[in-house]
């Protein structure tokens, strides 16, 4: 290095200043010498300058350029040693931030993905995002639903979000908040404010945040609003601050600057807020996401959404229980089977699903229609009535120790001989009266015999009223049996007593052969006492019978039936015990039967000769007129 001998007074100071400003490892090259000499005076002022020759001119220009390039590379590596985009750090950094900005102007591709991930990732520091306890009052400016993982807040209102980590993250860690659309058909769109709020003066004057950003940070001057140059995603980044003493959360105040219902913006499309914990070099240490809704009344909308969610859960549970029954093979029918007509309606209460069944054949269709109508009507029947019906069926199916009722004694061999041509049972068999001189009648009476046996063992007829009443009406009806008029909707004795609150008294009536309420119409309180009904139930049953008789208007034929039925059903003997008799429920009946009359001593026989037959004297005999006798001489002898 050569130095001139002549220097100005300020030359040394200037040189020292320039020399100290140079970096110690910089390399300098000399420029070509100008045509002027070193000692040439300019403008009449004597000046001199020092020239440094660090390289000789003999070195080629290409070699000097290569040396300059290597020197610049070393300088850039020291200036940005922490950049995640250098080859030295590419292998050491496992995960980069999807929202990190390019570190070099030569990068043409953005590292941020087109569709950011919204999967929760606690990471090594157990990153968590929580909210304070909030209410659903209509006056609340924000509220969070843990059930739905959804934040409800008003526009431009402060919403505190708590950040928690289990261990301190590395220095320089930042927290990023980015909005994305929730549904797949909208996820590629960028979430921005609507033009009305973006261009308006409200909430925009005096703000450092860009007008198009939806999310803002309040009370933090270190926040940065980022617009990805390739994907266009907008986000806001704030440095991570450790929690203060005595707390375990770091609170960040966010503002949402547009309503979810704004046209031109979100337009009622649901959004997700993605909160990520990132290092300085862009590595994601944790990720959390939740749904956001910006509305006018957060408390009301939260309550409505939670109620709807619970209803859907109940329906899903009900469908899951009935899922096995709905998955059947008969859902798929052959294509040749015609479809059901418009009259078929498949609707079930409490079930949203509708199923259609195709059936071949009209008869099968009608059977299934009856089943369908029965099931639909079953849903309309009150549960207490169903329980009463089931109790009645259990009582009817209970085995009884009593002998089953019979329609009279079995025909004796003598009756078979004399009545071999008959097809129908005799009058005596229908009314339960034993035939004369029949020793087999007494043991065959059973619990529903035709008469009662007194203490002496003689038969006492108890159905004289019924015989006389039907004797005058035997030729009125043209059929064997005319059905009675509709008395009551449910004539069952079990239903009647259950409705009165006396189900314990059923056995007292059924043990005596009383199975219908029409058998009890003319009972008195004394009769109920004879049936050994408990005293606390007697008055209730008697009043129920009185109300039943007053509420129904029976015809004359029905009244005759009731009188005859009760007369034949209840008879109190000398011992006070009640015996069961045979009851026939019929309004009119006519029996055609040919009987054999033995010889009674000629035409002079009186009416006393007919007393042993057990029925009234025929009109023809009372008028002394001969009756038709249908028998052969061989039968007489």
Swiss-Prot record:
Region entry Oligomerization, spans: 345-386
Top-rank taxon: Eukaryota
Residue numbers carrying Phosphothreonine: 27
Covalent link location (Glycyl lysine isopeptide (Lys-Gly) (interchain with G-Cter in SUMO2)): 628
Record-linked CDD domains: P53 (cd08367), SAM_tumor-p73 (cd09571)
UniProt-annotated stretches for the region Disordered: 78-104, 301-351
Free-text remark on how the cofactor is bound: Binds 1 zinc ion per subunit.
Residues reported in the UniProt entry to bind Zn(2+): 194, 197, 258, 262
Record keyword Transcription present: yes
Keywords of the record: Activator, Apoptosis, Cell cycle, Cytoplasm, DNA-binding, Isopeptide bond, Metal-binding, Nucleus, Phosphoprotein, Transcription, Transcription regulation, Tumor suppressor, Ubl conjugation, Zinc
Region annotated Interaction with HIPK2, chain positions: 345-380
One GO CC term on file: nucleus
Predominant subcellular localization, coarse grouping: nucleus
Stored SMART domains: SAM (SM00454)
Recorded family membership: Belongs to the p53 family.
Subunit field text: Found in a complex with p53/TP53 and CABLES1. The C-terminal oligomerization domain binds to the ABL1 tyrosine kinase SH3 domain. Interacts with HECW2. Isoforms Alpha and Beta interact with HIPK2. Isoform Alpha interacts with RANBP9. Interacts with WWOX. Isoform Beta interacts homotypically and with p53, whereas isoform Alpha does not. Interacts (via SAM domain) with FBXO45 (via B30.2/SPRY domain). Interacts with YAP1 (phosphorylated form). Interacts with HCK (via SH3 domain); this inhibits TP73 activity and degradation.
Domain description: Possesses an acidic transactivation domain, a central DNA binding domain and a C-terminal oligomerization domain that binds to the ABL1 tyrosine kinase SH3 domain. The PPxY motif mediates interaction with WWOX.
Protein name as catalogued: Tumor protein p73
Species assigned in the record: Chlorocebus aethiops (Green monkey)
